[in-house]
């Protein structure tokens, strides 16, 4: 499927998607054109789905980041998930087979904001039975 050079390209781009192809080429000992072709092939295979940025929530005034478990009535699972997608404070959303049916990454300005989000927004969605936020203390990786 992919070879060792492709894996290295992916590792480099995962750390910094803006790494110039010339720099990648030097690290791999191949031409910039070869890197360009490899990246294009990785995109066409769907291995690279897109490029993104990392945002520091604290710099935007969000002092709390949570991973929040949301449980629902089984028949309301997808409706609740669709509603959660609409909220700007939900930054990532996953269906889960673990302790909770839905897992959401939520940004909140402070404890009061988080309480408002949990009680008056998520908690009021029809079909939600339980909301369990876990505040992230430090991102390690």
UniProtKB/Swiss-Prot annotation:
SUPFAM superfamilies: Dimeric alpha+beta barrel (SSF54909), Winged helix' DNA-binding domain (SSF46785). Residues 2-63 form the HTH asnC-type domain. Homooctamer; tetramer of dimers. Forms a homodimer mainly through interactions between the antiparallel beta-sheets of the C-terminal domain, and further interactions lead to octamer formation. GO terms for molecular function: sequence-specific DNA binding. It comes from Pyrococcus furiosus (strain ATCC 43587 / DSM 3638 / JCM 8422 / Vc1). The lineage of its organism: Archaea, Methanobacteriati, Methanobacteriota, Thermococci, Thermococcales. Keywords: DNA-binding, Repressor, Transcription, Transcription regulation. SMART domains: HTH_ASNC (SM00344). This is HTH-type transcriptional regulator LrpA. The gene is lrpA. The keyword Transcription applies. DNA-binding protein that negatively regulates its own transcription. Interferes with RNA polymerase (RNAP) recruitment by inhibiting the association of RNAP with the TBP-TFB promoter complex. Binds to a 46-base pair sequence that overlaps the transcriptional start site of its own promoter. It comes from the Archaea. It holds the Pfam family AsnC_trans_reg. Residues 21-40 bind DNA. Consists of an N-terminal domain containing a helix-turn-helix (HtH) DNA-binding motif, and a C-terminal domain of mixed alpha/beta character reminiscent of a number of RNA- and DNA-binding domains.
